[in-house]
């Protein structure tokens, strides 16, 4: 099957490259040509000219309806000239064409001499009356002017409707992954492209991205809905339009410096009373970028190159080195990239790009970690992205393209020096991680170390036939990749303490989490992810309809390999596991745009699209028997030495038995609840479930209020299908009422917030001892819906000034009430009954030139805290109960038995979490952030120098970013673990030539 499919893909690639061409998912100029009587004019030569085009001009001829369409235009300033024998030439000048925008330019031609030219200079249209795709574009002026962290995510948080899992203040989070989401789609459903070529990473099903040097971008577009058949996923579709160099030597140097001495403090007395000794902060941020472009051969071969050094050293809240100094997460990135653009002939163009990124991180840690021992050190992580694309304009109507791109990310997360100990030695047993679950913190060691090596390769080709009224596209994309890992840990476990009762960290031993380490090199393979699409966009008077179909094949597998024995697992050898998954699905797309008044100023848009869930190797990883597995077991520190003692013996056939009797000398770990197949099989079985998909529809109206100012109102709804559920077949009950499951017995606990009784279910000892046989399968009763309402505006104010922003109201509701294997999951399972509010956000950003060469820019955003971001996994507020020891608080409302033990010592499992507040109904605090920037431009001939002053979080918001615990019984419940970066002041400069 795989060989046959690859043959089909190769044939499709060849056919597409040899067939008529494609629009490169960039911009277009379209319109209708008429004479002064209103009659349409066929045969008019329409020429678009711009310095942004290496070939200088692109021309087409209007069709029998007087319509024309010029596609695959780079963003830039254009002039459009209309010529026909017997008529005066007509020219529209100074048209600023943004990325991913279809600009309508109509022409009325007068009878006269061809040598006569009527030139009209006016404001470019701001409403796209041809496409239903919702697009927001940041041009180079906005990228340089608006204060951000200069990452694709940091810039993305300016876009209405886009949410980040963590806010980025002044680039303080630019060294680590932050994740964008929109319209209820997971972060893996984002598509990241350079010049229309996919450069997503492979890790986390494509959610993890490289660290792109923003100097390479001419513009960056963010599309969030109405995406056509040329793209698989329905999340944020991000396209970086590259700088190409040009016919004139040009370059720039940008620098920024933000030291901790210039940062304020937002650590309030309330946080200090909670035990937060220090807030978040920066040690320093340093950013220096050099870029140079120009011609190697004028009009034939251009180059662009850039080098960047970017360092962010963050203070970690409530973390100190042994000498008393604040804990610092020290890290830097070095980037070197180059791009070549070659106009091979009048019809063919080749572009190629390579970016090498090296990343270092000295102390990967969180609040209350012991920096010298518990931090993770990233050794020589290396990221490589590249891309090459050949495009051909065979005739004004026939265009082709084909290319290759890849994303390789290799990194090692290791213990700090001298923490790793030789396996099996006394030090190895003694130097395990200690985790304080109630009060927060790690010490003695990290929980483990690992290497990760994801690699993703992409080939794609496409073609289109373009007339004035039609744009027929067809194309194919083929991706493959591998993801290899290793994992190891001192002691093959970490120790968990819950010390809320004493208030003294690491004083109450609770449990151990054992691991199936060591894991030698193991991995998963994306055999193929293939998509073939066909789409036609056609215009009938004021109506433009786009219909398309996309068909996709996706196949992954687990690689076969071996690993040696560990403390809790025998030596293991597993064969490859194939077809996890093996999917083939259609994804139809439909949209319509109506030019309401025929003046290109008001557009009514509708879209109805199916988006398949993005996957790479995530499913294969879930069924890899070598996946990193953990199991929580009860631990009693009998001798009080802080070292968890005990192990397992293995027979020749791989079966096991405890090496000693629990609660005797040297035997402190209770293995009675350890599943029989721990570490020797994947805990989950693949149920061959179908691919999850989302049916999204949107209605939007866009109107140009006055020249250069447009407003947009929109509504979007998503309905997710083929959602899955994990069922442990050992505890499965087929009866109608899961509360009658014979593997469970009911017992009553009390809500510590209200005193109301709650029925929970104890697993029988016989059921608890059964092996874990998790089956992942489709759940026909599980539902997820998403609704959003947006109001946006965008203003081009002249002289480079711009302002954009708006409101977004969004809500996601989940119904997940299938409880055939565990009736405890019925609690808080239906969001339609959980009073989930709409999450609200407002954003505004822009830049404005002032007299004397001064430019003012800034952004303001207010949004729900991280736990209120739709489309992300949020945390339920719960009671964490350990059997036989956890007690009701003294102030528990009646009829709650205050002070009593909540669960008996015989309860199974050993710990139980009882949700009291639904995750989607809980918000931490609103994040309100105001960032401003002032710069002064000094011009010296062709050289300009602009010193700048930046201030981030001017309002000095102290909103919580994370909490110590969501366990309502903990004394640290909802206490701040980290807070917003306080007010941050920085200086910088831009030198351009």
Predicted regions and their residues:
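Periplasm-facing N-terminal accessory domains of Gram-negative outer-membrane beta-barrel systems
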Residues: 2-6, 10, 15-139
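Periplasmic N-terminal accessory/gating domains of Gram-negative outer-membrane beta-barrel systems
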Residues: 63, 87-244, 263, 270-277, ...
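Solvent-exposed loop/turn elements at secondary-structure boundaries
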Residues: 165, 559-587, 591-777, 890, ...
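Transmembrane beta-barrel wall of Gram-negative outer-membrane proteins
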Residues: 250, 280-360, 378-406, 588
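Gram-negative outer-membrane beta-barrel transporters
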Residues: 554, 704, 708, 712-870
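Extracytoplasmic gating/loop element in the C-terminal half of outer-membrane beta-barrel translocons
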Residues: 667-672, 759, 853-942, 946, ...
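C-terminal beta-signal and terminal closure region of outer-membrane beta-barrel proteins
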Residues: 922-924, 959-993
């Amino acid at each position: 099957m795989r060989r046959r499919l690859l043959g089909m893909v190769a044939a499709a690639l060849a056919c597409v490259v040899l067939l008529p061409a494609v629009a490169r998912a960039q911009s277009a100029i379209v319109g209708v040509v008429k004479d002064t009587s209103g009659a349409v004019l066929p045969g008019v030569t329409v020429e678009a000219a711009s310095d942004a085009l290496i070939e200088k001009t692109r021309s087409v001829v209007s069709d029998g309806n007087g319509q024309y369409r010029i596609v695959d235009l780079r963003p830039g300033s254009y002039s459009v000239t209309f010529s026909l024998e017997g008529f005066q030439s007509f020219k529209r000048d100074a048209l600023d064409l943004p990325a991913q925008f279809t600009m309508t330019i109509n022409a009325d031609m007068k009878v006269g001499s061809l040598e006569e030219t009527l030139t009209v200079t006016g404001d470019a249209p701001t409403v796209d009356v041809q496409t239903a795709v919702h697009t927001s574009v940041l041009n180079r002026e906005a990228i340089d002017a608006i204060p951000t962290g200069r990452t694709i995510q940091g810039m993305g948080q300016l876009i209405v409707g886009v949410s980040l899992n963590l806010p980025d203040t002044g680039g303080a989070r630019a060294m680590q992954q932050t994740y964008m989401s929109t319209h209820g789609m997971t972060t893996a459903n984002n598509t990241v492209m350079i010049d229309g070529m996919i450069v997503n990473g492979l890790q986390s099903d494509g959610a993890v991205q490289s660290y792109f040097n923003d100097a390479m971008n001419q513009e960056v577009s963010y599309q969030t809905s109405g995406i056509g058949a040329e793209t698989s996923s329905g999340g944020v579709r991000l396209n970086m339009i590259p700088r190409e160099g040009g016919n004139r030597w040009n370059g720039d140097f940008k620098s920024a410096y933000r030291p901790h001495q210039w940062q304020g403090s937002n650590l309030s007395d309330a946080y200090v009373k909670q035990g937060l000794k220090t807030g978040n902060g920066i040690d320093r941020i340093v950013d220096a970028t050099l870029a140079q472009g120009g011609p190697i051969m004028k009009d034939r071969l251009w180059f662009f190159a850039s080098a960047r050094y970017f360092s962010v050293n963050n203070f970690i809240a409530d973390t100190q080195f042994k000498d008393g100094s604040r804990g610092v997460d020290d890290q830097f990135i070095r980037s070197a990239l180059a791009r070549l653009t070659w106009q091979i002939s009048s019809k063919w163009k080749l572009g190629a790009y390579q970016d090498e990124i090296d990343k270092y991180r000295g102390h990967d840690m969180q609040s209350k970690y012991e920096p010298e021992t518990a931090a993770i050190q990233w050794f020589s992580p290396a990221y490589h992205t590249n891309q090459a694309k050949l495009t051909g304009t065979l005739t004004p109507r026939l265009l082709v393209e084909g290319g290759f791109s890849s994303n390789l990310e290799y990194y090692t997360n290791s213990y700090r020096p001298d923490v790793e100990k030789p396996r099996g030695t006394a030090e190895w047993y003694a130097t395990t991680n200690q985790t304080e679950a109630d009060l927060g913190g790690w010490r003695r060691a990290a929980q483990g170390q690992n290497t990760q090596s994801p690699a993703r390769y992409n080939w794609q080709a496409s073609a289109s036939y373009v007339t004035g009224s039609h744009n027929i596209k067809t194309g194919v994309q083929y991706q493959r990749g591998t993801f290899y890992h290793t994992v190891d840990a001192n002691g093959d476990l970490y120790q968990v303490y819950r010390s809320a009762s004493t208030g003294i960290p690491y004083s109450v031993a609770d449990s151990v989490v054992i691991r199936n380490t060591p894991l030698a090199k193991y991995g998963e393979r994306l055999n193929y992810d293939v998509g073939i699409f066909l789409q036609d966009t056609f215009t009938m008077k004021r109506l433009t309809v786009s219909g398309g179909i996309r068909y996709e094949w996706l196949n992954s597998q687990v690689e076969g390999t071996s690993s040696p024995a560990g403390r809790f697992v025998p030596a293991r050898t597993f064969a490859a596991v194939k077809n996890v998954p093996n999917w083939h699905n259609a994804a139809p797309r439909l949209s319509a745009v109506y030019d309401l008044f025929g003046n290109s100023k008001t557009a009514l848009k509708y879209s109805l699209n199916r988006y398949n869930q993005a996957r790479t190797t995530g499913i294969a990883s879930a069924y890899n028997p070598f996946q990193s597995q953990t199991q929580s077991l009860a631990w009693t520190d009998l001798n009080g030495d802080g070292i968890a003692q005990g192990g397992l013996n293995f027979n020749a056939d791989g079966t096991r038995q405890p090496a000693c009797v629990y609660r005797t000398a040297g035997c402190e770990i209770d293995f009675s609840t350890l599943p029989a197949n721990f570490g020797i099989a994947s805990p989950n079985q693949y149920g061959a479930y179908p691919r999850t998909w989302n049916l999204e529809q949107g209605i939007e109206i866009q109107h140009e209020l006055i020249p250069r100012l447009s407003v947009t109102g929109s509504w979007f709804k998503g309905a997710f299908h083929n959602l899955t559920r994990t069922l442990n077949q050992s505890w499965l009950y087929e009866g109608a009422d899961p509360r009658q499951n014979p593997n469970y017995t009911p017992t009553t606990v009390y809500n510590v917030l209200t005193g109301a009784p709650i029925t929970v279910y104890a697993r029988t000892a016989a059921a608890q001892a059964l092996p874990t046989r998790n089956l992942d399968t489709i759940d026909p009763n599980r539902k997820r819906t998403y609704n959003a309402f947006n109001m946006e505006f965008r203003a081009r104010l002249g002289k480079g000034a711009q302002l954009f922003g708006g409101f977004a109201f969004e809500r996601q509701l989940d119904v997940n009430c299938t409880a055939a294997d565990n009736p405890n999951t019925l609690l808080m399972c239906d969001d339609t009954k959980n009073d989930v509010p709409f999450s609200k956000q407002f954003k505004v950003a822009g830049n404005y030139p002032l007299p004397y060469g001064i430019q003012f820019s800034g952004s303001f955003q207010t949004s729900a805290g991280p736990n209120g971001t739709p489309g992300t996994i949020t945390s339920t507020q719960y009671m964490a109960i350990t059997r036989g020891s956890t007690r009701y608080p003294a102030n528990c409302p009646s009829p709650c038995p205050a002070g009593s033990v909540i669960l008996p010592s015989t309860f199974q499992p050993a710990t139980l979490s009882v949700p009291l507040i639904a995750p989607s109904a809980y918000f931490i605090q609103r994040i309100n952030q105001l960032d401003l920037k002032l710069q002064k431009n000094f011009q010296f001939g062709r050289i300009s120098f602009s010193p700048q002053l930046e201030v981030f979080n001017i309002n000095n918001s102290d909103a919580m970013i994370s909490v110590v615990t969501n366990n309502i019984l903990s004394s640290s419940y909802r206490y701040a673990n980290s807070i917003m970066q306080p007010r941050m002041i920085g200086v910088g400069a831009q030198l351009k030539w």
